[in-house]
């Protein structure tokens, strides 16, 4: 079954859990055990639902951080869950390119949401991607810390080395990460 179909089925499950205020994993277990008239959930739909359930707090915080004026809890149920699926794919599923996650979210939004939603979803997911790509990977941060530690050890053992001369103002030569906040359109 195509991943697009799996995303739609995952959205149905997340939507139902959200509308019923039911635990996502409990509902997923019900859907797996008793699919009813529907065909069984595809493996990728199950992976999405489990991933969103496991990381929902972090996903919602990330979406809140990059969306001004609209907190996740105030978004439409369909919009909110499309965003959660795509954010999970962007942040936690390296098998899906960011662009594909955004394109798939937009395809769902264009068929299931109101006219303003696709632009909002696109802007918010683009901001999430920008922030993700601007942040150093956890392993590269650890490597940099090891290198700095080695450099400071070498400087401490060499009395002729005068060390780094740094600006006492604390300013950094590194450019600031771009602000990626999205303003919702209000008519």
Curated annotation (Swiss-Prot):
Molecular function via GO: RNA binding
Start-end of Acidic residues biased regions: 141-151
Gene Ontology CC entries for this record: cytosol
Coiled coil: none
Listed InterPro entries: NusB-like_sf, NusB_fam, NusB_RsmB_TIM44
Family matches, as Gene3D superfamilies: NusB-like
The entry's keywords: RNA-binding, Transcription, Transcription antitermination, Transcription regulation
Highest taxon, organism lineage: Bacteria
Family to which the UniProt record says this protein belongs: Belongs to the NusB family.
Its biological purpose: Involved in transcription antitermination. Required for transcription of ribosomal RNA (rRNA) genes. Binds specifically to the boxA antiterminator sequence of the ribosomal RNA (rrn) operons.
Protein name: Transcription antitermination protein NusB
Source organism of the structure: Bifidobacterium longum subsp. infantis (strain ATCC 15697 / DSM 20088 / JCM 1222 / NCTC 11817 / S12)
